[in-house]
């Protein structure tokens, strides 16, 4: 991303306020984290408080994704431009929200951006025996997957996106994606760490998926994006 042409107009990161406070503390203390931000901005263009850092090209915001009005207000304060093509990425986020809460977030995103792509990485196939064992193990650690109902299958993942106002949706499990990687790259990855339980790894990858949905962007070819 040193090439200016590859940089997004602005990058937004959202996490719980308590997590953002810790991240901001690390950014302040570690030059390795602060230097890339300062290289792109003069110090007088940076705004920071306990739960937010905002600048011309980067913002990190402390917010609860279940509280849409608060989220929207904070994004507006950081000058999010909903007219620009926007990529939204969630990694094991929606599964910790109730289906109603995640649907509200997805509908808000679909309604807010003129041209957008939403990428979601989380669990899938959670109705089978392996999935149930995963759920039980997490519950024993007091980690409840409030939105696991929508993680039954690839179809339920796609339907969740389409019913929330996205125009197209696709989903693939991670084992399928892994099988499509170039063999040389797979060998390189597997040489980094010895895996003596390939069957377990395959089962795990069959229970995580990548889903993506698009809205608008026909001139950008968003609907044609595949793997």
Across the structure, where does each feature detected by a protein language model lie?
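Alpha-helical subdomain
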Residues: 1-227
């Amino acid at each position: 991303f040193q090439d200016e042409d590859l940089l997004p107009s602005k990058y937004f990161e959202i996490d719980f306020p308590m997590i953002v406070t810790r991240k901001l503390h690390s950014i302040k203390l570690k030059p390795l984290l602060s230097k890339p931000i300062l290289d792109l901005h003069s110090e007088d263009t940076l705004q920071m408080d306990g739960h937010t850092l905002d600048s011309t090209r980067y913002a990190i915001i402390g917010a609860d994704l279940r509280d849409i009005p608060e989220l929207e207000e904070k994004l507006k304060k950081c000058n999010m431009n909903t007219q620009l093509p926007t990529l939204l990425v969630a990694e094991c986020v929606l599964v910790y929200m109730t289906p109603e809460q995640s649907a509200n977030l997805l509908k808000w995103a679909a309604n807010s951006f003129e041209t957008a792509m939403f990428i979601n990485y989380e669990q899938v196939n959670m109705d089978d025996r392996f999935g149930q064992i995963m759920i039980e193990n997490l519950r024993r650690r007091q980690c409840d997957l409030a939105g696991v109902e929508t993680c039954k299958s690839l179809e339920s993942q796609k339907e969740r996106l389409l019913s929330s106002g996205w125009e197209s949706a696709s989903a693939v499990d991670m084992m399928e994606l892994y099988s499509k990687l170039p063999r040389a790259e797979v060998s390189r990855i597997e040489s980094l760490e010895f895996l003596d339980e390939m069957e377990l790894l395959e089962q795990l990858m069959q229970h995580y998926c990548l889903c993506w949905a698009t809205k608008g962007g026909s001139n950008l070819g968003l609907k044609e994006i595949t793997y």
